[in-house]
Amino acid sequence: MLKSGGHGSASEIEFIDSQRAIIRNATYTTCSRVPGPSWLPEWILKAASFQVNEEDNTIQAKDLQLRFHDVPILAAPTLTFPLDTQRHSGFLAPLIGIDSVSGIEVSSPYYWNIAPHRDATLTTTVMSKRGLALDSEFRYLEPLHQGQGRFNWMPNDSLRKESRWGLSAQHSGEADTGVSALGLVGVDLNINRVSDDNYWRDFPRAGLSLTQRLLPASGSLHWSQGDLSMMAQVLQFQTLQDISSPITPPYNRSPQIQARYNKWNVQGFDAAITADTTRFEADFNQVPGGATGILRNGQRSFAALQ
């Protein structure tokens, strides 16, 4: 704690062993001390006790208060925070908000340091007018791939009288085919789905990808070897409709397959051939009072020489 330039006071320090100590009736602040008896730090932590554990580099505070100009702004019966800059599993500071529709929102996030390249955050939220909501976020970073996923779930929305959920997941990486002539194949996934058309309006803080009205879900494979490259993808949209402001659904690509051959600097010329075949699909019945007689499906194929 002193490495950060902080200082404090205590009524008693009990050294349990070389790695652990208990500091009772303790205060801590990083505000510079000004000489004189009337000095008051801008902010100060007060606790009934700080339990210092240098073995796992953590401090556990009991009956903690954070005071700003001697006015308490945050209190917790117990709170654990790290002594160093390394990531540690534990509860994060609670979040409190007020929404004119959902009411008072109180969130308690728990950070789980699974491994140096993986972590997760589990958050429990109580909304005074809607009820209980659970949020989970998982992140990973591997040598050949990386990604993240987030899932929100409200078992019973008291205002909508239904269960609500939202899913957002992204993955990018390469997979080994096991065939030396093929090598690695790139894999990309982007999935965004919600339970109902009102999700974007009711949960504006659920994440940018889940608060839009056009939610893409796509999966693609891409491969290249020398001058030849190929790509195959499926792209589908979930359109969140509003009867007062309807959206015409975009065409899905189910699937799109593309091949490209490049040849550079052939006697001073560059040449490329691109072949593409795509099947388009769209359901215009999703539009409230939607138009009829419009071609819903189509397909195109072409080859271009450049």
Q: What annotation goes with each model-predicted range?
A:
Residues 1-306:
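Outer-membrane beta-barrel proteins and related beta-barrel translocases across Gram-negative bacteria
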